[in-house]
Amino acid sequence: DLEIEFGINLFSRKGNQLMLTVEGEALYKKAVYILQYCDELQADCSSTLRVRPPVHIGIPPMLSTVFFPELLEAFQAEHPEIPVVLEEYGSVRACSLVQDDTLDFALVNMEQYNIDKFNNIILADDQIVFCVSKDHPLAQKESVTTQEMSKEKLIFFNADSVQNQLLKLRFELDGCTPSIIMKSSQIYTTLQFIKSKKYGCFFYSCMTDKFSGVVGIPLATPIRVKIGVVWKKGKFISNDMQTLLN
């Protein structure tokens, strides 16, 4: 429609591929500028409103237990005028929602193939550990192999969890099949299963001290992960968002 309206070719068509022409590139850059200007205008207007739009942050269930309770409480004590809404999603889904502007930020496991699409701040370098009841037969081991874990009844997180993908790949590379009896994003439910002494799950090592009666066993071949905050490249950062980043 734009090509007809302006009488120019915006795309170069070769087979099933579309590429921007010189005119198309110029129009694209101007469109990006206009959209950013609209975002800035909206932010300026929002700052004068009595009700400010909240900053939307995506956070996986596991990470919400470690990072955000204290951080959010401290931030809101210092900046009570800035509303913040936390929304629970796995890291994969959270990144997708940041990309389409549904979320402003997301706290995620950064071991994803497309993580370079986002701006990021790394908050922690951690590892995945195998978690069992302190009375489980494996609880005293210094490390646990994939073969040993494959003999246990396992609880994995949901499909939109990066941790899930990393673990499945590890089992596959080691020629083992995990015995997954449940997939859940609910920490409390998972802990109840673990405390029955019959099941195992996978948490980040920084989490285990927060749960009584649970032991985190390092994997024989560690799976290390970086945890950080991501936001969309090229996105206009409002004053409230910048304050939160700072």
List the predicted regions and their residue ranges:
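A short LG(V/I)-centered, amphipathic sequence patch enriched
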Residues: 3-20
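Alpha-helical linker/hinge and terminal dimerization helices associated
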Residues: 5-6, 27-49
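Beta-alpha-beta core module
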Residues: 115-121, 126, 188-235
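Secondary-structure junction motif
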Residues: 139, 152-174, 237-245
